[in-house]
Swiss-Prot record:
Protein name according to UniProt: Sodium/hydrogen exchanger 8
Location of Phosphoserine modifications: 566, 568
GO cellular component: acrosomal vesicle; apical plasma membrane; Golgi apparatus; Golgi membrane; multivesicular body membrane; trans-Golgi network membrane
Gene (UniProt): Slc9a8
Catalysis: reaction(s): Na(+)(in) + H(+)(out) = Na(+)(out) + H(+)(in)
């Protein structure tokens, strides 16, 4: 009779040793069960994961829908004194409190759904916002002030990061607040230096403040986000390299080299991608198939972000410069239909992403355990305001030696006051790999408090302050109070400048754009060589086809409006 014994069983093979009465030993080796082709969950675990993902999608869409209704109510009932970002953050806080009560009563557990995931923010929500900012940029005012904007965005952000980071480090060494090492202090100073003056820009547009002030604040905020992310990544890179045995000068030089590589490498990659997209859509005529044309634009819009992140550069910096270049060259190679479609789609997607970010920012108060240290929070707020002042006032006085349009003390004060913090600092704070966990909770809690403090208090009081210091343009003073509108959604306007160079023929471009304008430097080089090389000059046939296409769309719209939903023409007189 055979006796069966199981032995030597491992994850790789199943070994069976059979001993028989004849003394013959037979060892059978059975193959390992096949692994799944993809590392996916199966069975009950897969079903639970699918249910959790479904609830996350449902919850996110529900939050967006409620926020859209809220923005609609702000516009309809003319609650123009309240910026959209402040309203959406407040709604997020309210919804977070309700969810916390539901969880406490054990009616449901939505804790996972309300979590603000940094990877989702950086991969899905932030790229459309940054690309739309670059694509809708008024490039005339931007490049006329590019020197001042770059100085504020790069050197100003670095100054603020060093002031905040250095202050936190030395206060910790003096046992005034919790201790952080040098790299962690600089990482926190870098992430908290990212300004996000969405509410302030809406107020600037509503009150028609000085256009130079508007562009300085807006331009700084666009570049500042990318610079802050690069500085934070630089600090994290130094932490990963364990540079405790390296001298201070070597640390500084390596950090500077890493920053320059990230900044200029990412900017060059984004610029190159934008130029390639212009050449592709210039020589491959997709204007008669707008769906293919639009699809190609969407691909090129996200392409530099993925490539930059894949080769350890800054995807945010790359996608920003790609958006600027594509709006300057590629946009004019598109058909009129795709031009309009691209602008409206980018506005819509950016609005949804911004709304989602601000809503989940409010929800995040209840998302994870907090470590609140009152002295740390107060000193951080003081350092943030002081770092912003050290950034704005000295650089403004320095720039006034070289500027024709001077930055007045009132403008400096508004620029200092408009340094609101948004979702980028919070997402970066969750992305930091700080140890132990109490340190991460302290940084996350402090960042949330600073962000909410600047958005709710500073953002909500910007309009009364502008009224008080009388920084409005002369035309704005003649506007009645009922015309003041703080809704970014309602005041979107035209994203791209009105002069569509692609609508000019070769002769018209030469006669009306180059000869009649006194262009110098890069603007002359761009108008004379770069623009003709990267954009398509229309023939008379192309121009005629474009006009027919737009006329057909206009007639179709008019027919739908004239007939109305019932198909009758009885209401035609009421429309006109």
């Amino acid at each position: 009779m055979a006796e069966e014994e199981f032995s030597n069983t491992t994850h790789e093979t199943f070994n069976f040793t059979l001993h028989t009465t004849l003394g013959v030993t037979t060892k059978l080796v059975l193959p390992t069960p096949a692994k799944p082709i993809l590392p996916v969950q199966t069975g009950e675990q897969a079903q639970q994961e699918e249910q959790s993902s479904g609830m996350t999608i449902f919850f996110s869409l529900l939050v967006l829908a409620i926020c859209i209704i809220l923005v609609h109510l702000l516009i309809r009932y003319r609650l123009h004194f309240l910026p959209e970002s402040v309203a959406v953050v407040s709604l997020g806080i309210l919804m977070g409190a309700v969810i916390k009560v539901i969880e406490f009563k054990k009616l449901a557990n939505w804790k996972e759904e309300e979590m603000f995931r940094p990877n989702m923010f950086f991969l899905l929500l932030l790229p459309p916002i940054i690309f739309e900012s670059g694509y809708s940029l008024h490039k005339g005012n931007f490049f006329q002030n590019i020197g001042s904007i770059t100085l504020f965005a790069v050197f100003g952000t670095a100054i603020s990061a060093f002031v905040v980071g250095g202050g936190i480090y030395f206060l910790g060494q003096a046992d005034v607040i919790s201790k952080l090492n040098m790299t962690d202090s600089f990482a926190f100073g870098s992430l908290i230096s990212a300004v996000d003056p969405v509410a302030t820009i809406a107020i600037f547009n509503a009150l028609h403040v000085d256009p130079v002030l508007n562009m300085l604040v807006f331009g700084e905020s666009i570049l500042n986000d990318a610079v802050s992310i690069v500085l934070t990544n630089t600090a994290e890179g130094l932490t990963r390299k364990h540079m405790s045995d390296v001298s201070g000068w070597q640390t500084f030089s390596q950090a500077l080299g890493y920053f320059l590589k990230m900044f200029f490498g990412s900017a060059a990659l984004g610029t190159l991608t934008g130029l390639i997209s212009a050449l592709v859509l210039k020589h491959i005529d997709l204007r008669k198939t707008p769906s293919l044309e639009f699809g190609m634009m969407i691909i090129f819009a996200y392409l530099p972000y993925g490539l930059a992140e894949g080769i350890s550069l800054s995807g945010i910096m790359a996608i920003l410069f790609s958006g600027i270049v594509m709006s300057h060259y590629t946009h004019h190679n598109l058909s009129p239909v795709t031009q309009i479609l691209m602008q409206q789609t980018l506005r819509t997607v950016a609005f949804l992403c911004e709304t989602c970010v601000f809503a989940f920012l409010g929800l995040s108060i209840f998302s994870f355990p907090h470590k609140f240290e009152i002295s740390f929070v107060i000193w951080c707020i003081v350092l943030v305001l002081f770092g912003r002042a050290v950034n704005i006032f000295p650089l403004s006085y320095l720039l006034n030696f070289f500027r024709d349009h001077k930055i007045t003390p009132k403008m400096m004060f508004i620029m200092w006051f408009s340094g609101l913090r948004g979702a980028i600092p919070y997402a970066l704070s969750l992305h930091l790999g700080l140890e132990p966990m109490e340190k991460r909770q302290l940084i996350g809690t402090t960042t949330i408090v600073i962000v909410l403090f600047t958005i709710l208090l500073l953002g909500g009081s910007t309009m009364p302050l502008i009224r008080l210091v009388d920084i409005e343009d002369a035309r704005a003073r003649r506007r009645s109070k009922k015309d003041v509108n703080l809704s970014k959604t309602e005041k979107m306007g035209n994203a791209i400048e009105s002069e569509h160079l692609s609508e000019l023929t070769e002769e018209e471009y030469e006669a009306h754009y180059i000869r009649q304008q006194d262009l110098k430097g890069f603007m002359w080089l761009d108008a004379k060589y770069l623009n003709p090389f990267f954009t398509r000059r229309l023939t008379q046939e192309d121009l005629h086809h474009g006009r027919i296409q737009m006329k057909s769309l206009t007639n179709k719209w008019y027919e739908e409006v004239r007939q109305g939903p019932s198909g009758s023409e009885d209401d035609e007189q009421e429309l006109f």
